[in-house]
Structures are given as structure tokens and as C-alpha cells.
């Protein structure tokens, strides 16, 4: 997989364009998510999702894949806040066939990894993908995009004015409920 990562991401650096901002960061470094149990979640992250995990603190561990960006998973027990599918983490795979294979594996291993929901595979917003809700009510999108989506999104630039309405009522994802 290292080869595929290096083929897809030839240049992983995006120079900041923040000359006029108050904060002048050099990188978006991390995000956070909650989990019931680090031990149970780590099994899912490593064995199913293929993420690298390091427990760097008693209540937390970091996960990453492919880039030097990480997610901090924090064990909060029963205080977990279930997420909506619009709050999800995306994992890119090498082909549509790989999306289909992983979708079948997700269904086959729902009980083993305590996967709560596996949604159908769809072609949407330019990617072939499906969503799954993990044991901690976090959502993951397994997707294939022919190219590197991050580069294309930013290279294409704004397609709509900030004065255009968001048309929130058309977001069918708002109707997808967590299993909580």
C-alpha cells in the first residue's frame, strides 16, 4: 500500500494561503473523535480499517494512514456523543472493486467489529463509496476517486458564491440516523 500512497500523493504539501488571517498555521495537524473503549476501538481501527495506532496517553491514542495527519481517539466511556453521517472520516482505496470488496467484508464482519450500520455502495459527489457507523457511533466513508480528490477540489476552486444558499433541505444524509 505504500507504493499506492506514493503514486497517488506525489506532493503532499499544500502551501498555506493565509497571509490575511489572524492565525497563520503551517498545517492542519489533527482532529479528534470519541470512543467507548480504546481497546475495542483499536481492534477495529487496526484489523478492519488498516490504521496505524499509538496509545500516547492513558485516555487517548492517535491513528493515521498515509499522511502525517492524525486523529486523536479519546476514551470517554458512556459520554460518547453519537455523530451524524455528515461528520465522517474518509478512507480512500485503490479501485471500485476494492470498495465493493470492503463493503462485503464490512457486512460479513459486523458482529466481530461491532459495526453498527453499513450503508449501500453509491456513486455520489464524484466518488464511488459507502458509509459505515462504527462501534463508537463514528462514521467512515470508504471511497474510490480516480485521482487525488484533495488536489482536485482545491485546484478547481470555488464553484459557488458564498451568497448562494446551501439548500440544507436537500441533504438526504440528515435523514440517516445513528443507532444510538
PLM features: residue spans?
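Vicinal oxygen chelate
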Residues: 35-39, 90-139, 147, 167-180
Amino acid at each position: 500500500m505504500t507504493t499506492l500512497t506514493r503514486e497517488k500523493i506525489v506532493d503532499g504539501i499544500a502551501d498555506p494561503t493565509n497571509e490575511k488571517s489572524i492565525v497563520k498555521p503551517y498545517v492542519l495537524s489533527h482532529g479528534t473523535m470519541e470512543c467507548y473503549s480504546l481497546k475495542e476501538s483499536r481492534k477495529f481501527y487496526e484489523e478492519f480499517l488498516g490504521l496505524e495506532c499509538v496509545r500516547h496517553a492513558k485516555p487517548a491514542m492517535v491513528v493515521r494512514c498515509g499522511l502525517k495527519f492524525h486523529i486523536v481517539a479519546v476514551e470517554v466511556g458512556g459520554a460518547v456523543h453519537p455523530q451524524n453521517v455528515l461528520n465522517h472520516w474518509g478512507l480512500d482505496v485503490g479501485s471500485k472493486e476494492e470498495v465493493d470488496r470492503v463493503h462485503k467484508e464490512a457486512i460479513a464482519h459486523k458482529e466481530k467489529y461491532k459495526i453498527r450500520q453499513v450503508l449501500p455502495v453509491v456513486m455520489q459527489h464524484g466518488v464511488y463509496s459507502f458509509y459505515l457507523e462504527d462501534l463508537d457511533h463514528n462514521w467512515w466513508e470508504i471511497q474510490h476517486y480516480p485521482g487525488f480528490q484533495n488536489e482536485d477540489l482545491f485546484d478547481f476552486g470555488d464553484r459557488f458564491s458564498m451568497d448562494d444558499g446551501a439548500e440544507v433541505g436537500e441533504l438526504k444524509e440528515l435523514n440517516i440516523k445513528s443507532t444510538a
